[in-house]
Amino acid sequence: MTDRYSFSLTTFSPSGKLGQIDYALTAVKQGVTSLGIKATNGVVIATEKKSSSPLAMSETLSKVSLLTPDIGAVYSGMGPDYRVLVDKSRKVAHTSYKRIYGEYPPTKLLVSEVAKIMQEATQSGGVRPFGVSLLIAGHDEFNGFSLYQVDPSGSYFPWKATAIGKGSVAAKTFLEKRWNDELELEDAIHIALLTLKESVEGEFNGDTIELAIIGDENPDLLGYTGIPTDKGPRFRKLTSQEINDRLEAL
């Protein structure tokens, strides 16, 4: 009787579940560990950059993505699904919002639009749920720094610190012990690296870790000068060398 419902996307089982969403969450749990930490002056998102082969060019792999100059995302689960969501998120931010209002959307608004896209995939014929969970970090003038988790069902929640993927249970336990209300961005980076170190198998260095921050505005990243009113982006990926320098200080 269970199989009768497990392959139906839009039919609830007698226990009140949608089997395909459970399978999508299983795909998330099989993915590498990703985490996010909110600090008083920024947000950190980080993940393991795991290559399927030592012959692969790891520098071309990217699991942390810029959605707007002040919002970034990381995922656990299926990479192709993530890339589709990144493209859709950027389209919403640029075409559906910035082109109309002249500015990028607040973090919560963009998160809700991404969640809507994911939710629609749970009740539409001919598609399947996205096999990915997202951690979206950002800053806006209304809410300051924020961190959200979006699941395949379309549910989303704000977090102080959280983790997704196969090592999420142990990572959350570690974060609960380390996080506090006065945590600053640099300390959050160290905690993120310490947390990932517990779950990463094999080499642990700047080439196998991807980490980004939402911090202060950085005019140097604009690529041009001479327009004082233009603010620099807050999203920035740390280089491999920057990560290695911090690992040496742990």
UniProtKB/Swiss-Prot annotation:
Question: Where does this protein reside within or beyond the cell?
Answer: Cytoplasm; Nucleus
Member of which family?
Belongs to the peptidase T1A family.
In Swiss-Prot or TrEMBL terms, this protein is called Proteasome subunit alpha type-2
Subunit structure of this entry? Answer: The 26S proteasome consists of a 20S proteasome core and two 19S regulatory subunits. The 20S proteasome core is composed of 28 subunits that are arranged in four stacked rings, resulting in a barrel-shaped structure. The two end rings are each formed by seven alpha subunits, and the two central rings are each formed by seven beta subunits. The catalytic chamber with the active sites is on the inside of the barrel.
Chain's gene name: PRE8
Alphabetically sorted, this entry's keywords are: Cytoplasm, Isopeptide bond, Nucleus, Proteasome, Ubl conjugation
Give a short account of what the protein does.
The proteasome degrades poly-ubiquitinated proteins in the cytoplasm and in the nucleus. It is essential for the regulated turnover of proteins and for the removal of misfolded proteins. The proteasome is a multicatalytic proteinase complex that is characterized by its ability to cleave peptides with Arg, Phe, Tyr, Leu, and Glu adjacent to the leaving group at neutral or slightly basic pH. It has an ATP-dependent proteolytic activity.
One GO BP on record is: proteasome-mediated ubiquitin-dependent protein catabolic process
Pfam families assigned:
Proteasome, Proteasome_A_N
Q: Which organism is it from?
A: Saccharomyces cerevisiae (strain ATCC 204508 / S288c) (Baker's yeast)
Question: PANTHER family of this UniProt entry?
Answer: PROTEASOME SUBUNIT ALPHA/BETA
Gene Ontology CC terms, in alphabetical order: nucleus; proteasome complex; proteasome core complex, alpha-subunit complex; proteasome storage granule
UniProt cross-link Glycyl lysine isopeptide (Lys-Gly) (interchain with G-Cter in ubiquitin), position: 108
* Lineage of the species this protein comes from: Eukaryota, Fungi, Dikarya, Ascomycota, Saccharomycotina
